[in-house]
């Protein structure tokens, strides 16, 4: 159920976020406690998840120091009390129809592409790579931005050029990789590998490219404990992969290839997911989630 904010017009609902109009140039982006997996919004909430995602994004927007959509601090007076800590006032942008994915390691859909073709998004890779192999250099592996309920599809850089033009495509690739490297280097000093992540970008009225939506959250990134890393096996994680793994386990009883939605998450998976998200935030930021603003603080 979305927040009823009397001062702002509700514009759209995503899998996790709600969007409201603040004025002609600004929007209110509210992160809920919903969680999605395999293109379904699950019938379970992760307590405090929206606050954790917001705290993580705010930390990384400051760390990477790239032009972004933030139009005020997390305690901006334009943010209603009932969503404080899980909402941000942002600039209205023309969003670009490309998911900008950076990969430092081979896993997920990238691994499936590689096993089928020896390539990821048209990029040829050496033979013999396995689950969680580290790339010599991070890869830009874009995807389409699917509508709610549809699948994102990996695409080649040539297709990005066709979609947004050569100049903008190069900007997206270069900015994505620069931001990823800076954040991944920081995370490694905190004992965490950021295996991959995805960004969204938009253009302001002057055509400037701005980083938007969420960044480096456990919803949009794979976080692995560095001291447990070993290529060739599925890694333990501090991210949404934990939920995906349970859904495809015998315990859940769910057939991913069937036509039924996933079952609700059991209490122990909900609690463990919350703990993992908080641990990722605290380890990477060096901050206590207990000190983050908003209801529940």
Curated annotation (Swiss-Prot):
GO terms under cellular component: cytoplasm
For the protein in the UniProt heading, the enzyme class is ligase
InterPro entries xrefs: SAICAR_synt/ADE2_N (IPR028923), SAICAR_synth (IPR001636), SAICAR_synthetase_CS (IPR018236)
Report whether Transmembrane shows up as a keyword of the record: no
One GO process term, biological-process aspect? 'de novo' IMP biosynthetic process
Question: Pathway membership of this protein?
Answer: Purine metabolism; IMP biosynthesis via de novo pathway; 5-amino-1-(5-phospho-D-ribosyl)imidazole-4-carboxamide from 5-amino-1-(5-phospho-D-ribosyl)imidazole-4-carboxylate: step 1/2
Which UniProt keyword terms apply here?
ATP-binding, Ligase, Nucleotide-binding, Purine biosynthesis
* E.C. number(s) listed in UniProt: 6.3.2.6
GO MF terms here are:
ATP binding; phosphoribosylaminoimidazolesuccinocarboxamide synthase activity
Entry-linked PROSITE patterns:
SAICAR_SYNTHETASE_1, SAICAR_SYNTHETASE_2
The record's listing under Gene3D superfamilies reads:
ATP-grasp fold, B domain (3.30.470.20), Phosphorylase Kinase, domain 1 (3.30.200.20)
Which reaction is recorded as catalysed by this protein?
5-amino-1-(5-phospho-D-ribosyl)imidazole-4-carboxylate + L-aspartate + ATP = (2S)-2-[5-amino-1-(5-phospho-beta-D-ribosyl)imidazole-4-carboxamido]succinate + ADP + phosphate + 2 H(+)
Q: Does the keyword Lyase apply?
A: no
Taxonomically, which superkingdom?
Answer: Bacteria
Q: Which PANTHER family match?
A: PHOSPHORIBOSYLAMINOIMIDAZOLE-SUCCINOCARBOXAMIDE SYNTHASE
Belongs to which family? Belongs to the SAICAR synthetase family.
Q: Which NCBIfam families match?
A: PRK13961.1 (NF010568), purC (TIGR00081)
Q: What is this protein called?
A: Phosphoribosylaminoimidazole-succinocarboxamide synthase
Organism encoding this protein: Mycobacterium marinum (strain ATCC BAA-535 / M)
Gene assigned in the entry: purC
């Amino acid at each position: 159920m979305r927040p009823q904010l009397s001062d702002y017009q509700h514009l759209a609902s995503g899998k996790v976020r709600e969007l409201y109009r603040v004025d002609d140039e600004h929007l209110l982006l509210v992160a809920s406690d919903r969680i999605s997996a395999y293109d379904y919004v699950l019938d379970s909430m992760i307590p405090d998840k929206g606050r954790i995602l917001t705290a993580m994004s705010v930390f990384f927007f400051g760390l990477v120091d790239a032009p972004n959509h933030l139009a005020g601090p997390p305690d901006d007076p334009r943010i209603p009390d009932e969503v404080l800590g899980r909402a941000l006032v942002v600039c209205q942008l023309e969003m670009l129809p490309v998911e900008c994915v950076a990969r430092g390691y081979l896993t997920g859909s990238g691994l499936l592409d590689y096993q089928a073709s020896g390539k990821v998004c048209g990029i040829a890779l050496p033979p013999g790579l396995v689950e969680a192999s580290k790339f010599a250099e991070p890869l830009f592996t874009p995807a389409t931005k699917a509508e709610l309920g549809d699948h994102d599809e990996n695409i080649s850089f040539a297709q990005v050029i066709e979609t947004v033009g050569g100049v903008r495509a190069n900007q997206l690739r270069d900015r994505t990789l620069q931001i990823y490297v800076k954040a991944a280097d920081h995370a490694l000093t905190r004992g965490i590998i950021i295996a991959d992540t995805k960004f969204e970008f938009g253009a302001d009225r002057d055509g400037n490219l701005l980083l938007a939506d969420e960044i480096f959250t456990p919803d949009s990134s794979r976080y692995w404990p560095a001291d447990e890393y070993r290529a060739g096996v599925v890694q333990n994680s501090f991210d949404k992969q934990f939920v995906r793994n349970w859904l495809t386990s015998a315990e859940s009883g769910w057939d991913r290839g069937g036509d039924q939605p996933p079952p609700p998450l059991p209490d122990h998976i909900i609690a463990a997911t919350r703990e993992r998200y908080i641990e990722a935030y605290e380890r990477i930021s060096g901050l206590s989630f207990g000190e983050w603003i908003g209801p529940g603080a």
